[in-house]
């Protein structure tokens, strides 16, 4: 980062020289220039009435919730119990939430009374990284507001068909690096429509669509975010008729490396009003959007086949449009399949209107073009790392076309190249161009992307009502009630589970759960068995039940029991809460006051019992729910595998023990292989999400123990969509520097916007944190060598 340090030095020298040589009069003149009037605010590109509530959509089932203090709990319970095709209607009012709302069922509609009438307030949220998390296909959210979420406002992941309309997401304290990262955040989803919505205060992007396809973003108001709208690593998007004003930057189209989905292309940005995006960048350090200077209208980074037309882009002091390679970030590219250069842009028939005045915001990227263009940057700036735009009517493949764009005086705009490919530098090591201009307007013709066609909304698949299944819970027989496995029984005792009828086991390295002791038991139907697998969970027959009871180690009282039941339709998780010796189904989750004595010290906290939908957050691999601990590598200790085989409960076990996968015990201090212990700990605690099929795979960080160490496993990996979770740090793991590593930071935090794991973490595992710290500090190499 020598160039960044040089830029900071030249900024300081220039400011000092201005004060010493020009004096107070020049300083006053500079302040006057900064304050002078801009061009007037234009009209919005849509009618205000579009944001008003509309008639509710047709639905197969409807749940109307009444206003009360416990609405958050009743809403989560309603979402869990809803059948596909259900409309859930929220009342007018402001309601507090201390946990995220997860929607797993497909074909659910969540509707309020209006974006300024129904408000879900997440100011005091203690668990979960977003306000609302949508994981079910065909999700519709409308006519409500989500405010003050510590992480993202509304996030969806891996779903097909999303409609968000007339929805408001806001951080009510105004622009701040302490705000959540994204307002509306679909990722790895398709057939997305976001319309007539408002987002303000996001510390990354107001509307952010990542790693997705078939996207329409229209008629939205995005103000006072870092980026108003960002389309990242996505294909086939239409962004039009939006009002993007008073952000740091209006609209971004980016493509980044080291992600599961890359190669962004075919985005159309048209008929938007992009106005006065001059708010100082307030993104937490370490996030890629933090490099974007204020005074930026539009920016394209490393994306291909982008068409930008019909936009009014007014009052931007840095540039109306910036087109750059990812290389300008100075972050090393370690992804061999990633193409860092933008190609084949067609920018035409836009109005780029900027006043003739200086604009300095104090950022590195704002200073550089001012130096190269003698304090008079053109409307369009390209980095010049490659020959990116036409200089004649006939163009080479991959070049971009800038044609028929006008400035504030209805004249032709200027296109300027910073000519970074020249390699020329000045005495301070800064790029010195020389800057190049492409003044003439060639009548070039670019490639137009197709209009986005959203697929037909799917019909809901009908399911059996739960009250019909509850009859299965009633039995007078002794032993396990096998007929009840298809029902969510209200009482744990309805299943007839006793430890003597199953096999009790432990894991080589267990997942940390606030120091709770765990009692694990597996039950198999008669004449059935598990089948060995070298990777992933053992193959379990239909009817398998896994019971895990969490016990306070000090009081020795059971707090909760979680069941995993393998039904005909797949695995399902059920949480049961203990009270006075009876365990009852509690699908909505709970916070339970607990106390333990740890190393002679009393610790008090609220233990989180997850709601039923939160089971999916850890156990879902793609669309398939799976057990985590029921895998050979975790069971392979204390002769457990052999005992299961001898019992007739495990088949296909390799005779040679050396052929059975084995991981280290994280707390085995007699094992001198520190990396094995640390990576086993990360695998069981983080790897169920951080793997190519887990919920966190969109981050590009994989933490399975068997993977070779690389950027993908965190070494010198920049954060993606981390928000405050980046902690002003640059990489997940910095060899030799645990305190500079995002991984260590997040493990040691209880802040819901930062902590990892996100769920069921009320205490920091100090012993596990110390293990990871020791491992990172002994790791060879540096990130600078990249």
Positions of predicted regions on the chain:
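Acidic Gly/Asp/Thr-rich repetitive segments characteristic of extracellular carbohydrate-active
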Residues: 60-89
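Sequence context surrounding c-type heme c attachment/ligation sites in exported
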Residues: 466-474, 480, 537, 555-786
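Extracellular beta-strand/beta-solenoid scaffold signature
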Residues: 75, 98, 122-133, 148-155, ...
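Extracellular beta-rich repeat passengers
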Residues: 166, 241, 256, 271, ...
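Right-handed parallel beta-helix/beta-spiral solenoid domain characteristic of secreted/periplasmic
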Residues: 64-73, 107-150, 173
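Right-handed parallel beta-helix
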Residues: 113-116, 137-148, 160-173, 190-205, ...
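N-terminal Sec-pathway targeting helices
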Residues: 2-22
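Short, T/G/N/S-enriched strand-turn elements that build extracellular solenoid repeat scaffolds
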Residues: 75-81, 96-105, 110, 121, ...
């Amino acid at each position: 980062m020598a160039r960044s340090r040089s830029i900071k030095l030249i900024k300081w020298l220039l400011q000092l020289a201005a004060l010493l040589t020009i004096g107070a009069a020049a300083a006053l003149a500079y302040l006057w220039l900064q304050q002078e009037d801009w061009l007037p605010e234009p009209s919005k590109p849509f009618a205000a009435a579009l944001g008003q509530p509309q008639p509710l959509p047709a639905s197969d089932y409807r749940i109307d919730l009444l206003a009360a203090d416990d609405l958050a709990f009743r809403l989560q319970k309603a979402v869990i119990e809803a059948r596909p095709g259900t409309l859930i209607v929220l009342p007018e009012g402001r309601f507090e939430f201390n946990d995220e709302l997860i929607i797993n069922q497909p074909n659910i509609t969540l509707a309020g009374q209006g974006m300024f009438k129904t408000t879900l307030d997440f100011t005091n949220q203690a668990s979960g990284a977003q306000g609302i998390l949508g994981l079910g296909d065909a999700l519709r959210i409308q006519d409500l507001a989500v405010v003050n979420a510590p992480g993202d406002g509304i996030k969806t992941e891996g779903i097909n068909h999303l409609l968000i309309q007339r929805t408001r997401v806001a951080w009510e304290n105004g622009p701040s690096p302490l705000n959540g990262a994204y307002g509306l955040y679909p990722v790895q989803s398709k057939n997305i429509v976001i319309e007539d919505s408002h987002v303000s205060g996001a510390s990354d992007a107001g509307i952010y669509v990542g790693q997705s396809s078939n996207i329409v973003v229209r008629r939205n108001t995005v103000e006072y975010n870092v980026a108003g709208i960002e389309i990242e690593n996505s294909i086939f998007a239409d962004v039009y008729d939006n009002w993007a004003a008073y952000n740091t930057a209006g609209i971004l189209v980016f493509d980044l490396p080291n992600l599961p989905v890359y190669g962004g292309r075919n985005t159309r940005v048209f008929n938007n009003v992009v106005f006065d995006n001059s708010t100082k960048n307030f993104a937490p350090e370490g996030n890629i959007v933090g490099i974007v200077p204020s005074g930026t209208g539009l920016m394209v980074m490393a994306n291909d086949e982008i068409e930008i037309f019909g936009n009014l882009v007014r009052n931007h002091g840095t540039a109306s449009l910036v087109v750059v390679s990812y290389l300008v970030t100075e972050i090393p590219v370690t992804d061999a399949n990633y193409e860092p250069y933008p190609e084949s842009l067609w920018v035409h028939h836009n109005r780029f209107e900027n006043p003739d005045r200086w604009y300095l915001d104090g950022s590195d990227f704002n200073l550089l073009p001012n130096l190269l263009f003698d304090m008079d940057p053109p409307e369009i700036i390209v980095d010049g790392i490659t020959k990116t735009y036409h200089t004649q009517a006939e163009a080479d493949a991959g070049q971009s076309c800038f044609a028929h764009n006008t400035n504030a005086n209805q004249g032709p705009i200027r296109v300027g190249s910073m000519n970074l490919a020249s390699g020329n530098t000045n005495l301070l090591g800064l790029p010195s161009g020389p800057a190049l201009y492409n003044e003439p307007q060639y009548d070039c013709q670019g490639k137009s992307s197709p209009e986005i066609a959203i697929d037909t909304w799917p019909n809901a698949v009908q399911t059996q009502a739960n009250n019909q299944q509850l009859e299965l819970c009633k039995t007078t027989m002794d032993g396990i009630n096998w007929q009840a496995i298809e029902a969510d029984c209200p009482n744990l005792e309805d299943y007839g589970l006793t430890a003597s009828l199953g096999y009790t086991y432990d894991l080589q390295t267990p997942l940390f759960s606030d120091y709770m002791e765990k009692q694990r038991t597996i039950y198999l139907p008669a004449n059935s068995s598990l089948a060995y697998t070298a990777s992933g969970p053992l193959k379990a027959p239909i009817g398998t039940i896994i019971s895990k009871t969490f016990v306070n180690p000090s009081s020795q009282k059971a707090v909760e029991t979680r069941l995993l039941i393998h039904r005909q339709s797949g695995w399902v998780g059920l949480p049961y809460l203990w009270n006075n010796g009876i365990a009852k189904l509690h699908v909505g989750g709970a916070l339970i006051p607990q106390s333990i004595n740890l190393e002679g010290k009393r610790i008090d906290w609220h233990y989180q019992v997850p709601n039923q939908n939160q089971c999916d957050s850890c156990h879902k691999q793609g669309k398939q729910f799976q057990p985590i601990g029921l895998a050979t590598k975790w069971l392979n200790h204390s002769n457990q595998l052999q005992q299961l085989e001898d019992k007739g409960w495990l088949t296909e076990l390799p005779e040679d023990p050396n052929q059975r996968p084995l991981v280290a015990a994280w707390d085995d201090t007699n094992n001198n292989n520190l990396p094995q212990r640390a990576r086993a700990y990360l695998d069981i605690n983080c790897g169920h999400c951080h793997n190519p099929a887990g919920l966190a795979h969109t981050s590009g960080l994989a933490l399975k123990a068997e993977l070779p160490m690389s950027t993908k496993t965190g070494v010198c990996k920049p954060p993606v969509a981390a928000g405050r979770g980046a902690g002003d740090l640059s990489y997940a793991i910095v060899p030799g520097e645990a305190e500079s590593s995002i991984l260590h930071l997040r493990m040691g935090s209880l802040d819901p916007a930062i902590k990892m794991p996100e769920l069921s973490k009320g205490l920091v595992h100090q012993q596990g944190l110390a293990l990871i710290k020791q491992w990172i500090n002994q790791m060879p190499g540096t990130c600078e060598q990249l």
